[in-house]
UniProtKB/Swiss-Prot annotation:
Assigned keywords, A-Z: Chromosome, Meiosis, Nucleus
Pfam family, one: Pro-rich_19
Biased composition (Polar residues): 104-113, 256-265
Statement: the UniProt record of this protein carries the keyword Cell division: no
Biological processes per GO annotation: meiotic cell cycle
Record protein name field: Proline-rich protein 19
Task performed by this protein: Promotes meiotic crossing over formation through its interaction with CNTD1 by participating in the crossover differentiation step of crossover-specific recombination intermediates.
Biased composition (Pro residues): 302-326
Consequence of gene disruption: Mice are unfertile in both sexes. Testis weight is significantly lower. Mice males show a depletion of late prophase spermatocytes. are depleted of post-meiotic cells and their weight is significantly lower.
Length: 366
């Protein structure tokens, strides 16, 4: 028997067959993961490892407030996103380039031997900006920034932008209007009336033509044509006068011989091709366009209504014109003053072609 007693066997307890190690839950693993990363971001280096130049810094200069721009969706208080990856504030200096950042960053007063540390310090601060709370680590609002430095940064930011003219208080609409008016006065000598321009741009529909101005135009066509009128206006008036000769002869017969002599067309002058369907703004906007030509071909102008006549006087009917061999005999290319004959309706065609009426049986859903 050994006098030292039984020898302890410490490794027998670890070799138990029924021992199962408990696995950590997800909450415990996440907590351990966050706790392992948070001290690395927040803890300060030990005092023994600090540079003596940093210890000798001015405490007032080291506590200078940072310039922070708070925009929509960004906070300045201590609020970190999921797993510390969400940035909630943005420094003004980060919007500028590195040269502007180094020129406008206040240099801390240090010794000459510590100048390399002072140069490297802004780089270290810029690296840890996303992990540090701007304006102090307390939960209160950040300190007020320095106004002169903020003004310099805004000026530098203004020079960086593409459109620096947007910052001064200028009335861009008024300047554009003055430029347009100055150009019009330099090219044409006057500013056109906006009401006349807008009236000429509005093209009336062929179905909704006003009847009273048409009658007034026919009545005014029998009057004298001023000499200073445009050439196309004279042609339109002469054509309307020619139409007035066969429509109301007793009205135009009372004109003077001098006026009748002014209505005579020169032998080498022809009527414009688009006089019947040309836009009312043709005289003001130059020669007719291709759109006016298509409109004159495919849109049939409605004839003006006959003027009121006494019961015993009837205007002479125009003679039927022989069809031209160059144009096909279609209603779209009919140049006669009479409107084309209306086409029969679809219901009439159906009733003539089908012996029974259109009737549908009741619809069954199933």
């Amino acid at each position: 028997m050994d006098p030292r007693g039984p020898v302890p066997q410490p490794f027998q307890q670890l070799q138990k067959p029924g021992r199962i190690r408990r696995r950590k839950t997800r909450r415990e693993r996440n907590k351990a993961l966050v706790s392992s990363h948070r001290p690395l971001a927040r803890q300060d280096p030990p005092i023994s490892s600090r540079d003596p130049c940093v210890i000798l810094q001015d405490p007032v200069a080291s506590a200078a407030p940072k310039l922070v721009v708070i925009t929509q969706g960004r906070l300045s208080r201590e609020h970190r996103g999921l797993f510390n990856h969400e940035v909630k504030s943005l420094d003004v200096a980060r919007l500028l380039n590195r040269g502007a950042l180094e020129s406008h960053t206040p240099q801390l007063p240090t010794k000459p031997s510590c100048s390399p540390v002072g140069v490297q310090e802004p780089d270290l601060q810029s690296k840890g900006k996303e992990n540090k709370v701007p304006g102090g680590s307390g939960p209160g609002p950040p300190n007020s920034p320095d106004l002169p430095v903020l003004g310099q940064l805004l000026e530098e930011l203004q020079y960086q932008l593409i459109v620096p003219q947007a910052f001064p208080r200028r009335n861009l609409v008024q300047e554009s209007r003055d430029t347009i008016i100055r150009t019009l006065q330099g090219c044409h000598g006057c500013v056109p009336d906006l009401a006349l321009v807008l009236r000429g741009c509005q093209l009336p529909l062929p179905e909704a033509k006003p009847r009273v101005p048409e009658r007034q135009r026919m009545a005014s066509s029998c009057m004298e044509v001023p000499e200073h009128a445009p050439r196309e206006g004279k042609q339109r008036t002469q054509q309307a006068t020619k139409g007035c000769d066969f429509a109301i002869p007793h009205t135009c017969n009372s004109t003077t011989p001098a006026h009748r002599g002014s209505q005579v067309q020169p032998p080498g002058h022809q009527l414009p091709f688009l006089s019947s369907a040309s836009s009312p703004s043709g005289a003001a906007w130059g020669p007719p366009t291709a759109f006016d030509m298509l409109k004159s071909i495919w849109l049939i102008a409605t004839p003006p209504p006959p003027p009121p006549q006494p019961w015993d006087v009837r205007p002479p009917q125009p003679l039927p014109q022989p069809p031209s061999p160059l144009l096909p005999r279609t209603s779209a290319l009919d140049w006669s003053p009479n409107p084309p004959a209306p086409l029969p309706s679809l219901s009439w065609v159906v009733t003539q072609s089908s012996p029974e009426a259109w009737s549908f049986p009741p619809m069954r859903l199933y």
